[in-house]
Design a protein with these regions (language model features):
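N-terminal localization/anchoring segments of enzymes in phospholipid and broader phosphate metabolism
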Residues: 1-559, 577, 581, 593-734
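Glycine/threonine-rich ATP-lid/beta-loop region of ATP-binding domains
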Residues: 569-572, 576
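Hydrophobic alpha/beta core scaffold segments
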Residues: 584-588
Length: 734
């Protein structure tokens, strides 16, 4: 390090000390969590607006923004409303009360919805029409031939399923299911007085929402595929549902309910049974949001507002089709692959491209898995082989979210049926996966597995599998540790990393983790792993503090960290202090970031970037320079209070230099990304990096290409070895 740099770092360290911890923890130096999350959804929306993306990819991104916003209202907004109802006045990390947050959220979400529908109406629908796919937005725009088609479809397919519901003295306002699409109407009796009556019908979720109409051909013989939404067909035929009435007005509407249920786990006699009860209540929680067409009759809106008990700020008048998550169905229509990013095939893992079994390969050395660039198959194979292997004595695994037809579940059940000791922690409290996890828990119990439902007051979010195997030299423990779920479906869509190892100390720690989960054991110390909520916060703070001390001493100091969210005040304050000491900090944070970056005297040494691309960034990676003796960790935890204090999480080290090199390259690419990255500015906004004079770098695309090249090179190497083995030169007689 140059003399000038050491002097500069010393000055910054002095400045940081002068400011003190109070300055680093001042609310003005933090961003509100909810508003930061909304900025993330805006970054996803940017991908929908980006005309360099294939058209159907843009549909997908817009659908994702809508789905994200639904969950945000059902969980985050609902939670804030609960705080207000309870009279909770304590400010958040940024100094905002719950009501202040709700006020800001209302303004920002209304702006976001306008941006969504501007993208939908002005950009995507015209582009679809230009590519031969015409969405007929209003039933009044149908041609006579199309009208006959949809009327026949209504009579034969839709009418038998519908349940029209009137409201009068004997029939109260119906219970409207969470997220259901409905059509509300005001009716007037034929030949009766002028009094208006309210009625509604739910758009049945059991029927497809996108209905294909006959293809039309223009005078130049160009074919157009025509589609219409189911609610338009129902609205066109509303008169058939209320024969003795005239339809004065009718409009689709949709609601979001509070889905953020809480459990008193101490009082629950049976956790599984209690969660099943709460899931039923989720459909009927407080209404958090009402969506209705923007030209809806105000008399109709008044009835809905009164009966659903919705505040004015929670009403969204929508200039287009409700519930844009339907665009994911449109993305799935056949015949449009040319308008999508070509599907990437996850590549084989080079270290496993041989004839040896999984256990032999792990004994050769730790194996790094990088999904979805490399296939998830080795993780499935690990459990399957263990289930069949007569030398395997026990399998233990934690499950948070799994796929609908999970091969992991099938393998665990088979292992139990084969007489092995199988222990599985199924986290029943995984939000919106509770119902699936209850089903899997019952299936595993039926197969003979010992199923644990989790720890009281904590969610088990760690991703760990332990296989205990009898071998010639004694018992050996094989462990898989990951940053992502044991879900073979999302492993093709999410970026995650994992390690397979038989390191004895990691094996000991893995055993201690499962003993902690299944019994009352709390280890006093750990060999290699750091586990929340016991020690993980302390571990991270010590690692950051070490870099701070190195920087103050003029030694090499830097931090590179990748995660989903960053909103822990104690961690952020430590990062601010490190920055003031001269530590270079590069953060890749996909979603929420409550830290302010690039502010002189606070965070001038911190850069934050978010990558939004074809795959969902989900890995957690932490690199600490440590005065030249670099340490690299991966894990399941973000830097959030819930992960560090209220969940069981695991941080694990990467030990092999060869694997460290790969992770460094991985992170270097993400820090060089100038196509899909967004860089946090001092004012809290995000901007795309300046690409002038630079080659375009897309980290996800580059990592795909690297995985393809690595697998190709490994195949070539094996072919050459095979050729050398088969070809034996004839020795000369001389």
């Amino acid at each position: 390090m140059k003399k000038e740099e050491k002097k500069d770092n010393a000055q910054k360290a002095k400045k940081g000390k002068e400011q003190g911890i109070e300055y680093f923890q001042d609310p003005k130096n933090y961003v509100n969590r909810e508003l930061s999350w909304l900025e993330f959804d805006c970054r996803v929306l940017e991908e929908a607006r980006d005309k360099t993306n294939p058209l159907f990819d843009r549909l997908k991104f817009l659908s994702i923004t809508a789905s994200n916003l639904d969950e945000f209202f059902m969980v985050r907004v609902a939670s804030l409303k609960d705080m207000v109802h309870a009279g909770y006045k304590k400010p958040d990390i940024a100094g905002m009360t719950a009501q202040e947050q709700l006020d800001k959220i209302s303004v920002r979400t209304h702006e976001l919805v306008v941006q969504q529908y501007n993208t939908y109406n002005r950009s995507l629908l015209p582009a679809l029409r230009n590519n031969g796919l015409n969405l007929i937005e209003c039933h009044e725009d149908l041609t006579p031939e199309q009208g006959e088609f949809v009327d026949r479809y209504f009579r034969e397919e839709v009418y038998p399923v519908l349940t029209p519901m009137a409201v009068d003295s004997s029939r109260p306002f119906p219970l409207v299911r969470n997220k259901s699409l409905n059509i509300a109407a005001l009716l007037k009796k034929k030949d009766g007085d002028e009094e208006l009556e309210f009625a509604m019908v739910q758009v049945p979720a059991v029927l497809p929402r996108i209905i294909s109409l006959p293809v039309t051909t223009d005078e130049d013989h160009n074919e157009t595929r025509n589609v219409i939404f189911l609610e338009e067909i129902i609205e066109r035929n509303m008169q058939q549902l209320f024969l003795n009435y005239d339809i004065v007005t009718s409009h689709p509407f949709r609601i979001m309910r509070n889905a953020d249920f809480s459990l008193d786990e101490e009082e629950a006699v049976d956790l599984l049974e209690e969660i099943e009860k709460q899931l039923k209540r989720r459909q009927w929680g407080e209404v958090i949001r009402l969506e209705i067409e923007d030209k809806a009759d105000q008399r109709l809106l008044k009835v809905l507002k009164r009966e659903l008990e919705v505040n004015e700020e929670d009403i969204f008048e929508i200039p287009g089709a409700l519930d844009l998550t339907v665009l994911m169905k449109m993305y799935g229509l056949d015949g449009y692959d040319h308008l999508k990013t070509p599907k990437y095939t996850p590549q084989p893992v080079p270290a496993l491209m041989n004839d040896d079994d999984i256990f032999t390969n792990i004994r050769k050395g730790d194996i790094l898995l990088m999904h979805p660039y490399e296939t998830f198959d080795p993780v499935v194979d690990f459990v399957r082989r263990a289930a069949r292997d007569p030398e395997v004595l026990a399998i233990k695994q934690t499950l948070y979210r799994v796929s609908g037809n999970s091969p992991i579940i099938a393998a665990l059940a088979a292992a139990a049926e084969n007489g092995k000791q199988v222990s599985v922690l199924v986290e029943l409290k995984a939000r919106f996966d509770e119902e699936n996890n209850i089903i899997w828990a019952k299936k595993l119990e039926k197969a003979g597995c010992h199923v644990i439902y989790g720890l009281v007051g904590l969610k088990t979010h760690s991703k760990i599998t332990l296989v205990v195997r009898r071998e010639e030299d004694g018992i050996r423990r094989y462990v898989h540790l990951g940053t992502g779920n044991y879900n073979d479906s999302t492993a093709k869509l999410y970026t995650d990393c994992g390690i397979m190892t038989c390191h004895p100390l990691i094996g000991e720690d893995a055993t201690a983790v499962f003993n902690m989960l299944s019994g009352y054991s709390e280890p006093l110390n750990w060999n290699m792993l750091s586990v929340a909520p016991l020690w993980l916060r302390t571990k991270f703070l010590r690692l950051i503090e070490r870099e701070t001390k190195n920087a103050r001493a003029g030694n090499p100091a830097s931090i590179i960290a990748k995660m989903n969210s960053l909103c822990d005040k104690e961690i952020i304050a430590a990062l601010y202090e490190a920055s003031c000491a001269g530590v270079r900090i590069h953060l890749v944070v996909r979603g929420i970031c409550c830290l302010k970056a690039g502010i002189p005297g606070l965070s001038e040494n911190i850069e934050v970037r978010s990558i939004v691309g074809e795959f969902l960034e989900h890995a957690r990676i932490f690199i600490f320079e440590n005065d030249g003796s670099e340490e690299i960790y991966m894990g399941s935890a973000d830097w959030m209070p819930r992960n560090l204090d209220r969940r069981v999480e695991i941080l694990f080290p990467v030990l092999r230099e060869e694997l460290k090199d790969r992770i460094r390259k991985y992170m270097e690419l993400e820090l060089e990304d100038n196509l899909k990255a967004h860089v946090l500015q001092p004012d809290g906004t995000y901007e795309k990096p300046d690409r002038r004079g630079k080659l375009p770098v897309g980290s996800q695309m580059a990592l795909c290409e690297m995985a393809v090249a690595a697998a190709k090179n490994e195949r070539k190497k094996h072919e050459q070895e095979e050729t050398a083995r088969v070809f034996i030169p004839i020795e000369s007689e001389n």
